[in-house]
């Protein structure tokens, strides 16, 4: 995920945005930085239920035990939210993911209070799915 910032830089960049329009544009930009998801990865087993838009998340564990995430969505803002979640879970093992609470990061970014209820529910669905897959691997 060399194209994406680390957690601390994400937070700094987000807080530098002057208003929510800039923050949404930054989220969309993060989504554009995600690598292209292969067509064969857009399968029902990688589809996230509970999202208003189509969302696919692929989780693989590398030889060092670190989880590598790939994902995509048919909506630009949702794809950006996928990127934010991936940044928060970057370089973690399955057990790290299970133990890590992303909510304090969302609070620092004031993210969830500026999302529509359906986007917030979709974000929670993504996090639940990632944590469930990680729990199965740990």
UniProtKB/Swiss-Prot annotation:
One biological process term in Gene Ontology: sulfur compound metabolic process
Catalytic residues identified in the record: 51
Location(s) in or outside the cell: Cytoplasm
Highest taxon listed in the record's lineage: Bacteria
Pathway, per record: Cofactor biosynthesis; iron-sulfur cluster biosynthesis
GO cellular component terms attached to this protein's record: cytoplasm
Complex and partners: Homodimer. Interacts with SufS.
Function: Participates in cysteine desulfuration mediated by SufS. Cysteine desulfuration mobilizes sulfur from L-cysteine to yield L-alanine and constitutes an essential step in sulfur metabolism for biosynthesis of a variety of sulfur-containing biomolecules. Functions as a sulfur acceptor for SufS, by mediating the direct transfer of the sulfur atom from the S-sulfanylcysteine of SufS, an intermediate product of cysteine desulfuration process.
Record-linked NCBIfam families: PRK09296.1
Protein name: Cysteine desulfuration protein SufE
Gene it is expressed from: sufE
């Amino acid at each position: 995920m060399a194209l994406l910032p680390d957690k601390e830089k994400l937070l700094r960049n987000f807080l530098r945005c002057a208003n929510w329009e800039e923050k949404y544009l930054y989220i969309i930009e993060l989504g554009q930085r995600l690598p292209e998801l292969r067509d064969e990865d857009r399968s029902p087993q990688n589809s996230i239920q509970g999202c208003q838009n189509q969302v696919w998340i692929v989780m693989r564990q590398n030889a060092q035990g670190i989880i590598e995430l790939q994902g995509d969505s048919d909506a630009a803002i949702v794809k950006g939210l996928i990127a934010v979640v991936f940044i928060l879970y970057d370089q973690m093992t399955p057990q790290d993911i299970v133990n890590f609470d992303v909510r304090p990061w969302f609070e620092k970014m004031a993210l969830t209070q500026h999302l529509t209820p359906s986007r917030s529910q979709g974000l929670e669905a993504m996090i639940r799915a990632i944590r469930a897959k990680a729990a199965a691997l740990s």
